Curated annotation (Swiss-Prot):
Catalytic-site annotation from UniProt: H50, H96 (proton acceptor)
The protein, known as: Phosphoribosylformylglycinamidine synthase subunit PurL
Catalytic activity: N(2)-formyl-N(1)-(5-phospho-beta-D-ribosyl)glycinamide + L-glutamine + ATP + H2O = 2-formamido-N(1)-(5-O-phospho-beta-D-ribosyl)acetamidine + L-glutamate + ADP + phosphate + H(+)
Lineage summary: Bacteria, Bacillati, Cyanobacteriota, Cyanophyceae, Synechococcales
GO CC term (a single one): cytoplasm
Pfam families: AIRS, AIRS_C, FGAR-AT_linker
Species: Synechococcus elongatus (strain ATCC 33912 / PCC 7942 / FACHB-805) (Anacystis nidulans R2)
Chain residues that bind substrate: S95, H96, N97, H98, R117, Q241, E313, S314, Q315, S556
Function according to Swiss-Prot or TrEMBL: Part of the phosphoribosylformylglycinamidine synthase complex involved in the purines biosynthetic pathway. Catalyzes the ATP-dependent conversion of formylglycinamide ribonucleotide (FGAR) and glutamine to yield formylglycinamidine ribonucleotide (FGAM) and glutamate. The FGAM synthase complex is composed of three subunits. PurQ produces an ammonia molecule by converting glutamine to glutamate. PurL transfers the ammonia molecule to FGAR to form FGAM in an ATP-dependent manner.
Annotated residues for binding of Mg(2+) 1: E94, N554
Enzyme Commission number(s): 6.3.5.3
């Protein structure tokens, strides 16, 4: 007989907490008894995928996590890297996918609030926010509603809390029609002498609850985020938290002030699983126990019971361990900032989380049973790739309509390029970032959309570093081509890391470290687990190749919705890579727009006449948008070529030879050239070489090849070409010249013109694509 057969709960009640029958048996074994309702809820949230990574932890263990600049790796609230000169950067990415599908404004807003708390809990002042967003078909009214809500939520919270939203990415694909992805990344500059850790210590030390009050909002949010979305869960608004950015601003200042007193032993924000997670993780990491009295917790609603206290995910709350005798000093700081602060418990030697309510024990669980000793599933990989992938890999370029110098099928190359520029994934995101205050704090060096990565000035406000003059900056980006990952997760994940490093290199930054957000479907299905495992393998390999260790991140699984026939439809596997890099000299930062008439254009990476699997139309934006086909093999990543191309690009920027740099990504080389022309309001005359042996669409729209488009001051051409010949002798090509805007964009293949468009045509198509679709409401 299993324990569940004699449980004081029905099978439906247990399943309602996200607990499987075999997991309930394990709970009884760990406790030596049946849990009560509050304890069942605590196990439900702490054993959810969102909190314990029970399906992904074995895969995450292969990631590289150590490096010369890594100060804090996985396991804390955020990673921390050493930037030199006493500057330390905290950074992390988190998801808020399910809440944003249900209530897009609050779901996205509280996602921003949560990631900011991860940063300042370490003792860092938040200096920048990025986001990686995925939505469905923008022609659909529901997608437009979600898009409006998510962007409004991000802008509301970030603008009000006073942290600039400086960059990120937005993509659209029908694969996300039912399940948008909202990943938020934040950066912070350390203000404290010591990094604040989460592990509790000091028997008898008081435990402080600080911040906002506790209510019933966000009940069971962690479990909600660890299950597929259904018609019922899409109406589950109580599982979505409600944030207050003005209160969070006060919390930032109060926490940083408190940390500087030296009276804080440990700190943990209350994010997923609220009080349950913060008490269990602090106790387990410190090898101690915690006693907490719920009657002392400040509340905003009456009649709450232990289950509700412990599972509430009310926002803007923190748990501190204070040095004994200094608790009042900390309480006074928080009261001065208009925040709640009470002693709600203490640290005990017995490694147990013990919860009191109305004078009795409401819950008593070994801390490690909630945090460390959780279920882990070692799932079996299929013997061969799934049928859908094998079938997609059979596609070849010969299956496309015939192409000539005029066009493909009945469409001209002009028309096809404009079609790609009109794709919301490629088009201008001005509608998005104009809603963000991207210059608050006055440290934003590059405006959103002007370069391949965000760049922020490092200007400490406190401590010895604030007295030094520094011209350093930090660059950050988020990247993933989910279509690649759907077709071939291993190569797609490698491509995400490579593109992130390439984007940083295009602004002159040295890639340093990675935070990842793994957005996938159900790992319990063979296809879902294969996608997850292959992507993790690719990420691990690529991070080692680029010497960019993983400092932490987030796993968001069960991103699936039921279609009209009741069949689950997973998203594309989307392993988002957040990467940070060091800009050694802010006077030498590069944008993507052409700068001066007469500048020479160079293609770094595989030249236009290359023909191997490092370039491909498989999985390309051209194939998906122009031919409504998702098939083929994405381009293979050549790590050695990537490293050499990126290094010479950074060198050219640091030397002042390169005036603009832009990587060739979605849409291929033609789109990259058009985007640089648009950004600089200048034209270009480009020749891609003879058509012999190549289709024109291969020359124009093939993706991959470690490619970067750069423009160079003519005065530096000789020294630049000498450096190229020394560093990447077979991987560069002079392809043209920057021209007056009136000359437009002219792309030829040998003597054969392919594209001739005015800069105004490019700007109008690219610049208004999203607004034209939103105007349909």
């Amino acid at each position: 007989m299993t324990a569940i057969s004699s449980a004081p709960f029905s099978a439906d009640e247990i399943a309602g907490e996200g607990i499987k029958p075999e997991e309930y048996d394990a709970i009884v074994e760990r406790l030596g008894r049946h849990p009560n309702k509050a304890e069942l809820g605590m196990f439900g949230v702490m054993w959810s995928e969102h909190c314990c990574y029970k399906n992904s932890r074995p895969l995450l263990s292969q990631f590289p996590t150590e490096g010369l600049r890594i100060l804090v790796g996985p396991g804390e609230n955020a990673g921390v890297v050493d930037l030199g000169d006493g500057l330390h950067l905290a950074f992390k990415v988190e998801s808020h996918n399910h809440p944003s599908a249900v209530e897009p404004f609050q779901g996205a807003a509280t996602g921003v609030g949560g990631i900011l708390r991860d940063i300042f809990t370490m003792g860092a002042r938040p200096i920048a926010i990025l986001n990686s967003l995925r939505f469905g078909d923008l022609e659909q009214p529901r997608t437009r509603r979600l898009f409006h809500g998510v962007v409004s939520g991000i802008s509301h919270y970030g603008n009000c809390v006073g942290v600039p939203t400086v960059g990120g990415e937005v993509a659209f694909d029908p694969a996300y029609n039912g399940n948008p992805l909202v990943n938020a990344m934040a950066l912070g500059l350390m203000e404290t002498d010591e990094i604040v850790k989460a592990g509790a210590s000091g028997i008898g030390n008081p435990v402080l609850y600080v911040g906002s009050t506790t209510g019933r909002d966000g009940m069971g949010g962690a479990s909600f985020a660890s299950a597929e979305l259904s018609d019922e869960s899409l109406d589950d608004r109580p599982a979505v938290q409600v944030g207050d950015p003005f209160l969070e601003k006060s919390l930032i200042e109060a926490c940083l002030e408190a940390f500087k007193t030296g009276a804080v032993v440990a700190a943990q924000d209350m994010g997923a699983a609220g009080l349950t997670c913060s008490t269990a993780e602090m106790a387990a990491k410190g090898g101690v126990g915690v006693e907490l009295d719920l009657d002392l917790i400040p509340v905003r609603e009456s009649g709450m019971v232990p289950y509700e206290y412990l599972l509430s995910e009310s926002q803007e709350r923190m748990l501190f361990v204070a040095a004994a005798g200094r608790e009042q000093e900390l309480i006074d700081i928080f009261h001065r900032w208009g925040l709640q602060a009470v002693v709600a418990g203490k640290i005990i030697a017995e490694p147990i989380v013990r919860i009191f309510w109305q004078g009795a024990i409401a819950a008593e669980i070994p801390a490690t049973a909630l945090s460390d000793n959780t279920p882990i599933y070692h799932r079996q990989l299929p013997d061969e790739p799934p049928a859908y992938a094998q079938q997609a890999w059979q596609w070849t370029i010969d299956q496309l309509p015939a192409a000539t110098e005029v066009g493909c099928g009945d469409r001209s190359w002009n028309d096809l390029l404009l079609t790609l520029l009109d794709s919301p994934t490629i088009a201008s995101k001005r509608w998005v970032y104009r809603q963000y205050d991207h210059q608050v704090q006055n440290n934003t060096v590059v405006l959103p959309g002007a370069a391949d990565a965000a760049v922020v000035r490092l200007r400490p406000q406190m401590g010895a570093a604030a007295l030094k003059t520094s011209n350093k900056g930090v660059a950050a980006t988020t990247d993933c081509n989910a279509r690649y990952c759907y077709l071939q997760p291993y190569e797609g994940a490698k491509a995400a890391v490579a593109e992130a490093a390439r984007n940083l290199s295009c602004v002159g930054a040295e890639p340093l470290a990675v935070t990842d957000n793994l957005n996938f479907g159900s790992p319990e299905k063979p296809i879902g687990y294969w996608q997850l495992a292959e992507a993790c393998r690719g990420l691990s390999e690529a991070c080692r190749e680029f010497s960019t260790p993983v400092t932490g991140g987030n796993v968001s699984l069960y991103n699936e919705t039921l279609d009209s026939d009741g069949k689950p439809q997973p998203i594309y596997p989307t392993p988002v890579v957040g990467m940070v890099g060091l800009v050694p000299n802010l006077d030498r930062v590069c944008g993507q727009g052409f700068q001066s008439v007469g500048d020479r254009l160079y293609l770094l990476g595989l030249p236009t006449q290359a023909a191997d699997d490092r370039l491909s139309l498989g999985g390309s934006e051209y194939l998906a948008i122009a031919h409504q086909t998702v098939a083929g093999l994405p381009p293979r990543i050549d790590f050695d070529l990537e490293r050499r191309v990126q290094a010479v690009c950074r060198l050219g920027i640091h030397q002042g030879w390169i005036r603009s740099a832009h990587d060739s990504a979605e849409g291929g080389l033609a789109v990259a050239i058009a985007e640089s022309a648009i950004a600089g309001s200048l034209g270009a005359r480009v020749n891609l070489g003879e058509l012999v042996g190549h289709r024109p669409d291969w020359l124009l729209f093939a993706e991959g090849g470690a490619r970067i488009l750069v423009s160079v001051d003519p005065a530096h051409v000789a020294v630049w070409e000498a450096e190229l010949q020394a560093q990447i002798p077979a991987a560069w090509q002079a392809i043209g010249t920057v021209t007056e805007a009136d000359a437009g964009l002219a792309i030829a293949a040998g003597n054969q013109p392919l594209v001739q468009l005015s800069v105004d045509q490019l700007q109008q198509t690219w610049g208004g694509a999203i607004e034209r679709r939103l105007a349909k409401d």
